[in-house]
Amino acid sequence: MEFVIGLLALFLILFATGYLFRKNIYKEIDRLEAWKIEIMNRSIVEEMSKIKHLKMTGQTEEFFERWRREWDEIVTSHMPKVEELLFEAEDCADKYRFQKSKQVLAHIENLLSAAESNIEDILKEIADLVSSEEQNRKEIEEVKERYTKVRKNLLAYSHLYGDLYAKIEADLDTVWEGIKQFEEETEGGNYIEARKVLLAQDRLLEELQSYIDDVPKLLASCKQTVPQEIAKLKAGYQEMIDKGYKLDHIQVEKELENLLKELKRAEDALLDELDLEEAAAIVQIIDETIQTLYNQLEHEVEAGQEILGKVPELAAALEKLEASKKDTEAETELVKKGYRLTTGELEKQQSYEKRLEMIEKQFEQVRERLDQKHVAYSLLKEELADIEKQMEAAQREHDEYRDMLQMLRKEELQARELLKQLKQTIKDTARSLEKSNVPGIPEAITEKIRQSQTTVQKVTEQLNELPLNMDAVNERLQEAEQLVTEVKTKTDELVELVLLIERIIQYGNRFRSQDRILSEQLKEAENCFYAYQYEEAYDIAARAVEKASPGAVARLEADAKQPE
């Protein structure tokens, strides 16, 4: 039973698969059939009828005959073949020969694609032929009008073209021959060939129109404008030489010689080769070179004018620097009597003097060359600019040195003022200790006080020495300031601690009669207090009172910090 069911299932699967394959093949056959009908219905004959009004000779006749043959072949050969193959594909599908059916359908696809491509080529060639005829008919009149206009202009202004007149006229004759060839091709039905001829004449006319417009300008530039500019530049150059300008670095004569050679090359390109683009490019380079030379000469004139104004200005500035140097030398000698200058500080003055000496030598050399006119103004201008920068640097160096000298006196005054403040701080600290209830001063603080007093005394002695060494004074003064500040801080802390201990003990006295242990602890704190062991006295008293009255010490400390 199971075997029968299996066979039945297999049969159903095979039947379903065959059905699906046949369905897909029938669908493809229908598509190709529709494509074939579409090709057969294409209006090729109608499209070919569009050229009936053209001259049916030459290329037109050849095209028409070929198109008709190709269309007849499609209709009478390709399409019947396709119809036959469609029946074959359907028959193979009915007999379950699916592989063979697919091969036939692929062959049909290729035949229809080839026919479609052939038809598209025919339609494009028809459109090109019709379009060429229409464009030729419109544009030939424009070309003839332009030809007439160009020839009239050439005749009217023939004197402007010189030797080029014959070449341009020969090109115009070529255009006319081209127009006649166009008419012959059109008459012979060769519309596409006529189109090529017409476009060639159109391009040649554009080129000739460019010649008509540009040749007179270029000839004028080569024959008149540029030679005049070169002559003008040469005259200006000679005038500057006569006035004493040194212009060897510009090499104007060599440049002018090169310009004349380039001008000859531009004329040859124009007259011999009728190469307007090359001639125009050469003329442009010549114009730019002339302008560059003018700019260089003008720069030389401007440099000369600037130098004539700058030299007296720098001379006056150098005299001022020299006077400042002498004043500073005198001031240095005066300062050296009262202050000890370091080697580095003295070297700054020597460096400034050497720099000034070098600047004066360089400036004198420039003045000599200027008087003898041995060098171009533009080169001297650069040297003067360098000298001016050096003078500015020397002035800054001098100002820094002067500021340093003045700073020494200012530092001395500041040191004396700070020393006065430190001495007063020591006195105030001692007075504060005397006024307080401190039973005695710990040895560590006493030693710091002695050190600060000794250091302050040494600073005082250094300030009274001549010459004064401010570096040593400032170093010792900084040490004294640190010691005095430390003494004042520790003294203030000591006074505050003593007052706090007294308050804690006084507060604890109210519990002495009630607490024997507290009484003994306070007694111990008092002993430490009068033995100058203040930290230990505070710890003992604070622990005892805090035990008897929690939070009391914190309240007492807060009250002690409140201003009275």
From Swiss-Prot:
Its main location: membrane. Negative regulator of FtsZ ring formation; modulates the frequency and position of FtsZ ring formation. Inhibits FtsZ ring formation at polar sites. Interacts either with FtsZ or with one of its binding partners to promote depolymerization. It comes from Bacillus licheniformis (strain ATCC 14580 / DSM 13 / JCM 2505 / CCUG 7422 / NBRC 12200 / NCIMB 9375 / NCTC 10341 / NRRL NRS-1264 / Gibson 46). Belongs to the EzrA family. This is Septation ring formation regulator EzrA. It comes from the Bacteria. Keywords: Cell cycle, Cell division, Cell membrane, Coiled coil, Membrane, Septation, Transmembrane, Transmembrane helix. Residues 1-2 are extracellular. It is a single-pass membrane protein. One of its GO terms (biological process) is division septum assembly. The chain crosses the membrane at residues 3-21. The keyword Protein biosynthesis does not apply.
